[in-house]
Amino acid sequence: MIQQQTMLTVADNTGARKLMCIRVLGSSGRRYASLGDVIVGVVKDALPNMPVKKSDVVKAVVIRTVDTVRRPDGMCIRFDDNAAVIINDDGNPRGTRVFGPVARELREKNFTKIISLAPEVL
C-alpha cells in the first residue's frame, strides 16, 4: 500500500533515485495505491545531468510493493521494496530501461511497454 508521504525507489534510468508520493490518482478521496496504480510524486533524490531533476513533480506507476498482494488463484506476492517507474502523460515510461522484477498485474492495467522493458516478470 502506497499512500501520501511514502518514499519509493525509482526503478528506471531517468536519473531519479527516490520519489515521494504526494497523490494517488483515481477516484476522489482514494487513499492507497497498489501494483499498477498511477501516483503523482516529487523527486527527492536525483543524479546530476539527467532528464529528471530534484523537486520535479512527475507521474509514476507502482511496480513493486512490500505489502502482500493476493492474486485470484490464491497466490500471494510480496517484494523487498516499494518501487515505481516514471511515466509521461500518455502512460509510456520516460526511461529506456527498467531495473528489477515487475509484477504481472501491470499487464492487466495496460502497461505493456514497462513489461517489455523489465528483465523479469513475476
Swiss-Prot record:
Keywords: Ribonucleoprotein, Ribosomal protein, RNA-binding, rRNA-binding
Transmembrane segments: none
GO MF entries: large ribosomal subunit rRNA binding; structural constituent of ribosome
GO cellular component: cytosolic large ribosomal subunit
Gene3D superfamilies with a match to the protein in the record: Ribosomal protein L14
Superkingdom of this protein's organism: Bacteria
Keyword Ribonucleoprotein annotated: yes
Keyword field contains Isomerase: no
Matches recorded under InterPro entries: Ribosomal_uL14, Ribosomal_uL14_bac-type, Ribosomal_uL14_CS, Ribosomal_uL14_sf
SUPFAM superfamilies attached to this UniProt entry: Ribosomal protein L14
Any one of the GO BP annotations: translation
CDD domains documented for this protein: Ribosomal_uL14
Subunit structure: Part of the 50S ribosomal subunit. Forms a cluster with proteins L3 and L19. In the 70S ribosome, L14 and L19 interact and together make contacts with the 16S rRNA in bridges B5 and B8.
Protein purpose: Binds to 23S rRNA. Forms part of two intersubunit bridges in the 70S ribosome.
Family membership: Belongs to the universal ribosomal protein uL14 family.
PANTHER family: 50S/60S RIBOSOMAL PROTEIN L14/L23 (PTHR11761), LARGE RIBOSOMAL SUBUNIT PROTEIN UL14M (PTHR11761:SF3)
Name of this protein: Large ribosomal subunit protein uL14
Highest classification ranks of the organism: Bacteria, Bacillati, Cyanobacteriota, Cyanophyceae, Synechococcales
Name of the gene encoding the protein in the UniProt record: rplN
